[in-house]
């Protein structure tokens, strides 16, 4: 069915892919991504594991409406989270040869 050495090679490839996936997960968890809203007036920096590192708010917003500022912070966080997801997909495609994850399946596994 697998030919001479076929099963052994298949297992070796699976192990190598698993090692690359583990390294990728560690790399993604350590990376930082910046999300923005309000044309860059609010910036949120998060890690690949979605931990917030920094929130930067332009001074000009300090005098504005509190509710608007809260909305901008939420939008900046959502932008950063979206960027993390995009980066994960790009890095994952490099390992899997472009094979996409099934819908709803996210890293880490």
Swiss-Prot record:
Which Gene3D superfamilies does the record cross-reference, listed alphabetically?
A: Nucleoid-associated protein YbaB-like domain
Say if the entry is tagged with keyword Cytoplasm. yes
**Family under the similarity heading:** Belongs to the YbaB/EbfC family.
Its subunit composition reads: Homodimer.
Role played: Binds to DNA and alters its conformation. May be involved in regulation of gene expression, nucleoid organization and DNA protection.
What is the protein's major site of localization?
A: cytoplasm
The protein's matches in InterPro entries, at most eight in alphabetical order, are given as:
YbaB-like_sf, YbaB/EbfC
Disulfide pairs here are none
Membrane spanning segments where?
Answer: none
Q: Organism classification, top ranks?
A: Bacteria, Pseudomonadati, Pseudomonadota, Gammaproteobacteria, Vibrionales
Task: Drop me one GO molecular function for this one.
Answer: DNA binding
Compartments in which it is found? Cytoplasm, Nucleoid
Q: Which keywords describe this protein according to UniProt? A: Cytoplasm, DNA-binding
GO CC terms of this entry: bacterial nucleoid; cytosol
Q: What is this protein called?
A: Nucleoid-associated protein VV1_2004
Per the UniProt record, the source organism is Vibrio vulnificus (strain CMCP6)
Pfam families tied to this protein: YbaB_DNA_bd
């Amino acid at each position: 069915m697998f030919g001479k050495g076929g099963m052994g090679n298949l297992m070796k490839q699976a192990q190598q892919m698993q090692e690359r996936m583990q390294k990728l997960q560690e790399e993604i968890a350590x990376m930082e991504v910046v999300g923005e809203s309000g044309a860059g007036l609010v910036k949120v920096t998060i890690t690949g594991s979605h931990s917030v590192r920094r929130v930067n708010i332009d001074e000009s917003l300090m005098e504005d409406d509190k509710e608007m500022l809260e909305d901008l912070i939420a939008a900046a966080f959502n932008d950063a989270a979206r960027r993390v997801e995009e980066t994960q997909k790009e890095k994952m495609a490099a390992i899997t040869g472009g094979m996409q994850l099934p819908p709803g399946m996210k890293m880490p596994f």
